[in-house]
Regions:
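Catalytic-core regions of core metabolic enzymes
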Residues: 1-684
Length: 684
């Protein structure tokens, strides 16, 4: 859908252009003129013969042919205007900044559809409606401010919200972040974030194109396209960070009223981002911090040296790095002692390296050199240096600027004195560097970048399962929850181990069969979906008499059809499950069972199909992972078996895409084996 008429037009016509730069059509023209567009510009305004020095036409029928039309007129006039442009003026690219379309109601949706039909009939491209426009190397087609200078090595920004794009650019420019192509897709009636990413991927040149891509999404209309092209770009050398808004019911409602978006589960989105290699961000501040990190050398290890003259900042940064899985290793030995001789008395080199409020530019340079060349246990440096009010810090920032250029290890500058050292910071930014004004924000962003996995590059191989048997079960069901027998057949076909059990609706038969099990046992009602809520689970049954009494009680529960008896197993409770969001592949979940999932929500997710590496990452990212390994004298579980079960569950839903929900909770795990104790499956 993206075409050269959009990216590099020879002629641009602004319909609704104005001499009043307080109006969108007026400021749009002003920005294009000021941006140095080298082609021909036409204006359409029935009341003016000249608009900002440009010849103005009264009607669209009067203009010459035009590559790109930018529309800034009321929504009700857009369908006919665009039809004329497409059919009579050979226009192939359209930007509609007007609002009042799909986000406003049924009439707006109808206008939107008429517009799409006209544009598609000429294989054209539409950005919008309800957007701020676009910036390319050719033109500055936005009606807002600020308008960043195009930097071919800056960040590409693709946003589902025009205002958010403005806020990101405004805040980014203050930090030293530069921008290249900017696309505000608005309602994305024809061209969405995924489509622009597709074009960037298919035409990517790692030597010439911007490497950093920033996304703000309110809807993911084509998850598979996003996954395919984001992961492809990252494999080619690009770096992508994204915000996905509308992940709660409240956020979804706000997104719906804004652009007609439908929110998807935050957990599913995170799983998609992880599979693609996209860094997940939850705010503009975090997005820009990640973008800033992308603009520095890649962090190859987790060991960070904190270099500062501010002890409190160092403590906060060390805490944040540690919480995020990075390390601030102790620095010691002969080289550390030698470094100390260059610093003032009272300085510390243990890490954080604190060279006091009186520390000099020369001392900073020496410290960085030692971290670069002498301290092999250091992978990167964070330099926190503000203005203590004792001296001009420009020399300090000059040294930092030089070291940023020549050091192989990444250096992340935190220059917090945005008032005291405003002039010096601006001088630093003009040299092409980026500032992190807050050390905690840097710590969070560094951790987020470091723990984001590389995109899945392997051909995913899933365990062998009995697909024929799975289909024989699924094909007999239309929708709803499977019964116990059907669920057991699916588990067996997927070769997911399950506990031995008896299911009977006759007490006499159950009492006869119970001899095959060892006490203690667990008895569960069959029929009600939520057994615990129905008080249909009884533990620690140690005799036939208790079996008889419990059977009678359980069969009195509403909708009870039978009673299930299982051995009462000892071990660590685990959980695996499946959920399916519209448009997405199945999301596979894993975690610890019991309180860990119910109260602490300690769950990790991956998008099916799940590779072995992905399954391992899912397990190891759990907050309760130490319990899986074994902690405080408690024996752990067989991690390899847990990983295999996650993969087998993925194989099951790949064979049975009709499954919409599934959970196995709990699995009971020991060092020797892991078995499913309870499961439920929903299709439809």
């Amino acid at each position: 859908m993206v075409n050269q008429e959009l990216l590099n037009p020879k002629t641009i016509t602004i319909i609704g252009a104005s001499n009043d730069t307080g109006k969108p059509g007026g400021n749009m023209l002003k920005n294009i003129l000021a941006g140095g567009f080298s082609g021909i510009i036409y204006a359409v305004n029935p009341k003016e013969k000249k608009v900002q020095g440009i010849t103005s036409f009264a009607e669209v029928k009067d203009i010459p042919q035009t590559d790109l039309a930018i529309i800034a007129i009321p929504a009700k006039y857009c369908p006919e205007t665009i039809k004329n442009l497409a059919e009579e003026k050979n226009t192939k690219a359209f930007i509609i900044i007007s609002a009042g379309f799909g986000e406003a109601g049924e009439q707006g949706k109808q206008w939107e559809q008429e517009i799409i039909t006209s544009i598609n009939s000429v294989n054209g491209c539409l950005i919008g409606p309800n957007c701020i426009g676009a910036i390319t190397e050719s033109y500055k087609g936005v009606f807002t401010a600020p308008v960043p200078q195009f930097n071919p090595k800056g960040c590409d920004l693709i946003s589902g919200s025009g205002a958010t794009a403005v806020f990101i650019m405004e805040a980014g420019m203050a930090l030293g972040v530069s921008f290249a192509n900017v696309f505000s897709v608005g309602n994305a009636a024809q061209t969405g974030v995924e489509d622009i990413l597709e074009y960037m991927d298919e035409n990517f040149n790692a030597e010439k194109d911007p490497l950093v891509k920033l996304l703000y999404l309110e809807t993911i209309s084509n998850p598979q396209k996003l996954l395919k092209h984001a992961s492809s770009l990252i494999k080619k050398g690009a770096k992508i960070a994204a915000i996905k808004a509308g992940s709660t019911a409240e956020g979804s409602r706000a997104a719906t009223s804004h652009t007609g978006a439908i929110a998807s589960s935050d957990m599913t989105v995170r799983a998609l981002f992880n599979k693609a290699g996209i860094v997940y961000c939850s705010s503009r501040e975090e997005l820009l911090s990640v973008a800033s990190i992308f603009n520095y050398r890649k962090l190859e290890g987790k060991n960070i040296a904190i270099i500062t003259h501010a002890g409190g900042s160092a403590v906060m940064l060390a805490d944040e790095l540690s919480k995020g899985g990075l390390k601030v290793p102790e620095i010691s030995g002969l080289d550390a002692e030698k470094l100390k001789t260059f610093l003032y008395p009272g300085s510390s080199v243990a890490n954080p390296i604190d060279f006091l409020a009186t520390g000099t530019a020369e001392q900073l340079g020496i410290i960085i050199d030692y971290c670069e060349h002498k301290f092999d246990n250091i992978d990167a440096m964070a330099v926190v240096f503000g203005s203590p009010g004792l001296f001009d810090v420009e020399n300090v920032y000059n040294v930092l600027s030089v070291k940023l250029e020549i050091c192989n290890k990444p250096i992340f500058p935190v220059l917090p004195s945005v008032v005291n050292a405003q002039r010096e910071i601006q001088s630093f930014l003009k040299k092409g560097h980026i500032n992190f004004p807050d050390e905690v924000v840097l710590g969070k962003a560094l951790s987020q970048v470091f723990k984001t996995p590389e995109p899945i590059s392997e051909e995913i191989s899933l365990p062998k399962i009995d697909v024929k048997k799975i289909r024989s079960v699924i094909d007999m069901v239309t929708e709803g929850y499977l019964d116990a027998e059907q669920t057991e057949k699916l588990l067996d076909a997927a070769r997911i181990p399950r506990v031995t059990e008896l299911v009977e609706n006759s007490k006499e038969k159950l009492l006869t069969a119970i001899d095959s099990l060892k006490f203690p046992v667990v008895m569960k009602v069959v029929g009600p979906l939520h057994k615990s809520d129905a008080k249909g689970v009884v533990l620690n049954i140690t005799s036939k008499e208790e079996v008889s009494e419990t059977f009678d009680r359980l069969m009195q529960i509403d909708s009870a059809t039978a009673v299930m008896v299982q051995p009462q197993l000892a071990g660590l409770e685990l959980f695996v499950g499946v959920m399916k969001e519209p448009g997405f592949n199945h999301t596979i979940l894993c975690g610890l069972g019991g309180i860990f999932i119910e109260v602490l929500n300690d769950v990790s997710a991956g998008l099916s199909p799940i590779s072995k590496n992905e399954a391992q990452q899912m397990v190891q990212s759990l907050r309760g992972y130490k319990l899986i390994q074994g902690a405080r004298g408690q024996k752990g579980v067989d991690e390899n078996q847990f990983v295999e079960i996650i993969q087998r569950l993925s194989a099951l839903v790949e064979a049975a895409p009709e499954i919409t929900e599934m959970d196995i909770n709990p699995l009971i795990g020991t060092q020797k084996n892991i078995v499913a104790v309870d499961a439920r499956v929903r299709v439809g």
